[in-house]
């Protein structure tokens, strides 16, 4: 299996939203929680361990960083029931069952403390700057959510949900024949979100796990009830599920993956276009909009333009945060013993492979 990619955090209208806690509680046999500040090589450490596990033929799930999707915040080793994850802010993790299930891997030992203190003023200024940019981004995302809410209300009022329920029941009757071999477990992970590179979605992960794809064309949360129904039906049939929340509104679902069936239901729209060839398309936006008046449609076009403008502003703020964070990491780099970090990564690789 090729590695696949998810997110466990999202930049949402609620601020940073974390799903990292689901890794705790003894769920994994070995959860390594990395501790260390900026620039100490946490992402490189995880990438090195993940690459070694791939070479050993292990199945690896990588967790992208919501602040920088080119960086890693975790790696899960399915065949070992083990994982390594960045446990620092904004997704702080503390062991539930220390050492027996979860344990710290401390990278702060590789800092030259005196060298870092010599750059104290620079480090403080850059830390405060990137945090301020994040606060700005979250204010803008909240505003975007308020604007979007008006459009959603108008579209929900026109949606024939009873018709959608009947269609959902028909799809599930065809697709979920027989029972699964799992326990009906639900793992939650984001497929993407708003980042400094704009809005992204890892549809490549969907295609790697589930070749049979139902594309739900929906920009207003019209499909949330349908997706919840899919989850419940799959659980009842003992299929394990990956439920992917909407990164803008994490209390709602955006995608559901049922890998054992090779079946996925994904949400796609102008902000997150799916360029592949789905098995079926469900045009929920069209179902709602066909009943709108000309004046209502004009208002929706206006709100979409406002949303797009606010999204651009949020991405700009996240880009500014990324620049400040890069500068902060560069300030720390001369203070880090990277040979020591690499040696520790190799020890953890050897320990994992001996399990």
Task: Explain the meaning of each model-derived region.
Residues 31-50, 197-234:
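Glycine-rich phosphate-binding P-loop
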Residues 122-174, 302, 306-348:
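An accessory alpha-helical subdomain
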Residues 27-28, 80, 209-212, 261:
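Residue-level preference for short coil/turn positions at secondary-structure junctions
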Residues 1-23, 162, 166-204:
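N-terminal pre-Walker A segment at the start of P-loop NTPase domains
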Residues 34-35, 45-46, 53, 61-64, ...:
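A cross-family "folded-core" feature that marks the main globular domain of proteins
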Residues 30, 177-184, 212, 343, ...:
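N-terminal low-complexity, Ser/Thr/acidic repeat segments characteristic of secreted
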Residues 1-15, 47, 51-115, 122, ...:
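Conserved nucleotide-sensing/catalytic segment adjacent to the nucleotide-binding pocket
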